[in-house]
Amino acid sequence: MAKWREMGLTDEEYRRIVEYLGREPNEVELGMCAVMWSEHCSYKSSKIHLKKLPTRGPAVVQGPGENAGVVDIGDGLGIAFKIESHNHPSAIEPYQGAATGVGGIIRDIFAMGARPIALLDSLRFGKLHSPRVRHLFTGVVAGIAGYGNCIGIPTVAGDVYFQESYEENPLVNAMCVGIVELSKLKKGVATGVGNPVLLVGATTGRDGIHGATFASEELSQDGEDKRPSVQVGDPFMEKLLLEACLEALEYGHIVGMQDLGAAGLTSSSSEMAARGKSGIRLYLDRVPLREEGMTPYEIMLSESQERMLLVVEKGYEDEIIKIFKKWDLNAVVVGEITDGEEIEVFFDGECVAKLPYRLLTEEAPVYDRPYRIPEIKNLQSINPAGVDCGEALRRLLQSPNIARKSYVYEQYDHQVGVNTVVKPGYSDAAVLRIKGTKKGIAVKTDGNGRYVYHNPREGAKRAVLETALNLAVTGAKPLGLTNCLNFGNPEKPEIMGQFVEVIAGMKEACEILNIPVTGGNVSFYNETGEKAIYPTPVIGMVGLIDDLETGLIPMAFQTEGDLIYLLGEPTGELGQSEFLKEFFGDVLVPVPPVDLQEGRRIIELLPLLKKQGLINSAHDVSDGGLAVSLCEAAFAGELGVNIDFTTSLLPQEFLFSEKVGLVIVSVSPEKEEEFIKSVKNAGVFVLKLGRVNGKDEIEICLNGQRVIQEKLSELKALYEGGLSWALK
């Protein structure tokens, strides 16, 4: 096989490289082009579609194109945040794959000059009855916990689903959030002819070589041969690197800073050069090596972790090096900025590579791949009337997709740094205090591939609205979103069709909800053999609560005697709900349409209701439907529920539909009249469901008939134990 094909390049791509250079590249140059032209680094199949997403908003300080997006939260402060995938490595080596995914996203945040304050993770696995899936799940969770806990950054939120489509290809999407003084915001740019280029942090080894290429192809049935492509992480080294970088930034005289992630020194140098429109000359014999005999090819493509590339003002390099030495870290001048337009690489006095930075970045191919919009056909109907509502509630509460994820977050230190206001499991989103202010931020990841698979456009709209509602029910105003788009092979028209429709759905949702996209990540080739994952857009979002004392809305029911209301109009569709899957299997029932306008009104209304003192709690209706959401609010508040309502829907439809855009709120009886007036003035549909009681029970009567009467303590035991039981 031709060398370029082994590296992941097509014949046409190789021809383009030769034509651009006017010569054949040598091995080092070919390797550099191959990693930078990989799907993982170049976004060559997705770029033309990603440009359709709205990226501007009043709070946006930094949009796509940098290490992370940044939004303004006032007081001269910004929030830097980004989500990225580490799917392929985690399928081969779950602990290290997940751990290094966390490490990489943390470096993206502090490269902006921000101090990381929180981690989130969005995970997808096959069904837990498979020993391999249990191995992957426990390994990934341990890897995230091991890295995050050691570095001292709390893992505060996330989401986990278990569905057949992720059997061979798990998804590990990690998000990091950091806080930055906007006046000290730093970018990954290389400028200033003669300025030195420093490589700081860990030594360079052979781990992760061609990791970016590995992430740009389908997994084989036996991925063991790819184990060397998985990087190895050292969280203690990363902690030192984090503190040293922030201290160096505080000292000043740093022009730009970039993480060495996918494609290692090749990508960090070429991306910094492209942003600064400058050349860079590198001397590889100065690079501190972990292993003897490493070639220039290996040094340029190594993805060894815990390394950063810095451009420093000439004359200040010795002071910067002293800072890193104080933290017991390597810091070496490995090059300088030139007035050319090339990345020049020297080794033992010989030029081993000389490539225009444009060839590695903006000249990478961009494909408008053929696509076929998925047909939504052979739709079926079901009659759920025969399903006992009490039995359904019990089964759903202990389903691994709904049951409390105590097994996961009890391994994470979610309190380290003492910024966490609400613990995992007690809110729809994590809430973090911004020290020195009254403010808080709410952060969340969300997405549901099964809905997207059955209707990519509506499913994508659902993912955006669901995440925004998760913030709004805490009292937060959404400021911006990042996304991780996980799909199969883009060379297949049906997969590309899913992607195009998802982008269209996200675009519509972001525009109507006024939430700009600040960046993200695309992960293609999540496919083994002919089996692709569900198309899975994962949305990460950040929102602002102006005053935690007066603006924070709890999820838990607060007071016996409070009235329970539903915001939004229930329509009863069961398409792709957990109820449908549990009792009817894979039935092609239509996905409920998403009412973005109603969702927007509710998102804007909730913080106002709290500020007016008109609601005591709020919780959005999500997985499992209204019945499960009522239980979750009751469990959190240790209070019972009485529902007495008349509806034209079947009880099963009313209680277990997962229509997005419904929110349960509790209201003091003396505030009821004012509450209803405010809600109706906002144009939001509202229904009175019942009231909070002090008993150990949930009682639901519909149309004069009791359909559920259960002890809350027994239901809570199912909810608390479901995931642990599934792992046994």
From Swiss-Prot:
Which residues participate in substrate binding?
A: 85-88, 107, 231, 303-305, 523
Which molecular function term from Gene Ontology is one that the record holds?
A: ATP binding
| Primary location class | cytoplasm
Where it sits in the cell: the answer is:
Cytoplasm
UniProt binding sites for Mg(2+) 2: 108, 259
Reactions catalysed according to its record: N(2)-formyl-N(1)-(5-phospho-beta-D-ribosyl)glycinamide + L-glutamine + ATP + H2O = 2-formamido-N(1)-(5-O-phospho-beta-D-ribosyl)acetamidine + L-glutamate + ADP + phosphate + H(+)
Pathway of action: Purine metabolism; IMP biosynthesis via de novo pathway; 5-amino-1-(5-phospho-D-ribosyl)imidazole from N(2)-formyl-N(1)-(5-phospho-D-ribosyl)glycinamide: step 1/2
Query: Which keywords does this chain's UniProt record carry?
Result: ATP-binding, Cytoplasm, Ligase, Magnesium, Metal-binding, Nucleotide-binding, Purine biosynthesis
Question: What is an example of a Pfam family matching this protein?
Answer: FGAR-AT_linker
- Binding annotation for ATP: 43, 82, 483, 520
Q: Which GO terms describe its cellular component?
A: cytoplasm
What sections of the sequence does the record tag as coiled-coil?
none
Q: What is its EC number?
A: 6.3.5.3
Annotated Mg(2+) 1 binding lies at 84, 521
User: A single GO BP annotation from the record?
Assistant: 'de novo' IMP biosynthetic process
Gene3D superfamilies to which the protein is assigned, alphabetical: PurM-like C-terminal domain (3.90.650.10), PurM-like, N-terminal domain (3.30.1330.10)
Q: Which residues form the active site?
A: 40, 86 (proton acceptor)
Give the protein's function: Part of the phosphoribosylformylglycinamidine synthase complex involved in the purines biosynthetic pathway. Catalyzes the ATP-dependent conversion of formylglycinamide ribonucleotide (FGAR) and glutamine to yield formylglycinamidine ribonucleotide (FGAM) and glutamate. The FGAM synthase complex is composed of three subunits. PurQ produces an ammonia molecule by converting glutamine to glutamate. PurL transfers the ammonia molecule to FGAR to form FGAM in an ATP-dependent manner.
Tell me how this protein assembles: Monomer. Part of the FGAM synthase complex composed of 1 PurL, 1 PurQ and 2 PurS subunits.
Family stated for the protein in its record:
Belongs to the FGAMS family.
Q: What is this protein called?
A: Phosphoribosylformylglycinamidine synthase subunit PurL
What are the leading ranks of the lineage?
Bacteria, Bacillati, Bacillota, Clostridia, Thermoanaerobacterales
